[in-house]
Structure formats: C-alpha cells, structure tokens
A protein has these predicted regions:
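Conserved short histidine dyad/triad with adjacent acidic residue
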Residues: 37-51
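Histidine-centered metal-chelating micro-motifs
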Residues: 46-47, 66, 82, 86-91
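Glycine- and acidic-residue-biased ligand/ion/polar-headgroup-sensing regions
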Residues: 54-65, 70
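A cytosolic small-molecule/anion-sensing beta-strand core signal
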Residues: 61-62, 77-78, 96
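Structural motif
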Residues: 64-66, 73, 89, 99
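Short acidic-glycine-tyrosine-enriched beta hairpin
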Residues: 71-86
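Ligand-binding loop in jelly-roll beta-barrel domains
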Residues: 86-110
Length: 115
C-alpha cells in the first residue's frame, strides 16, 4: 500500500479543514482502496454539485440534507444513506445543521495531499 492511516483516529487529534462556506471536514481512516471522511455542515451550507471517479456512500450521522445524485433529489435525515456512482453529478444542501460520514473507493488521494 502506498498510503495508509493510523489504526485509530481520535477526533480531538485530527485537523478540521475548510471544505466550502459553512462546511468543514476531517479525514479519518484510509488506505489505497478506501477512505472515510467526516463532514460537518452548518444550516444552509451547500455541497456544490461535482463529479469524481470514486464510488461514494454517505451516512447521515445527524441533521437534514437535500441530496441530488444522478438527477434524483431526495431529503435524507439522521440514519439514512446515499449512494453515488462513479462519475455521476451529485451534491447537497443542508436544511438542518448536521454531520455526514462519507466513504470513498478508491481513496481520495486529493484529500490526503491537503492534510
């Protein structure tokens, strides 16, 4: 493996990085094949629509979000999930402040380079 995180991650030890207006993220566990990222949104913040070649699965830890993926828009809440196919345009709008747990395969090397 070229890149790999430590075995344990502690929120208090991981730097929050700016990911847009009202959005911050922490890079959690990763290796070449997989990555987990915690993303915190303020109410009204937008995850700008974008594409990437990675498969993405998102778990809504808290809050309420309007997600659009592959041309379909739905409201998701704590406990819900969203799947984004590789190369598909997707984004979200935060309706109530919350946290998303994003997983990517393969890992987002562009994220690790910023930490």
């Amino acid at each position: 493996m070229d890149m790999e995180s430590n075995n344990f991650q502690y929120e208090s030890e991981i730097k929050w990085e700016n990911a847009g207006e009202g959005v911050v993220r922490q890079i959690m566990a990763y290796n070449d094949d997989l990555m987990m990222v915690k993303v915190k949104f303020e109410t009204g913040a937008v995850g700008t629509p974008h594409t990437h070649p990675h498969t993405q699965a998102t778990y809504v830890e808290s809050g309420v979000f309007e997600f659009t993926t592959d041309g379909e828009t739905k409201i998701v809440r704590a406990g819900d999930g969203v799947y984004m196919k590789p190369g598909v345009l997707h984004g979200c709008r935060c309706l109530e402040a919350g946290v998303l747990i994003d997983t990517f395969s393969p890992m987002r090397k562009d994220f690790v380079g910023r930490v």
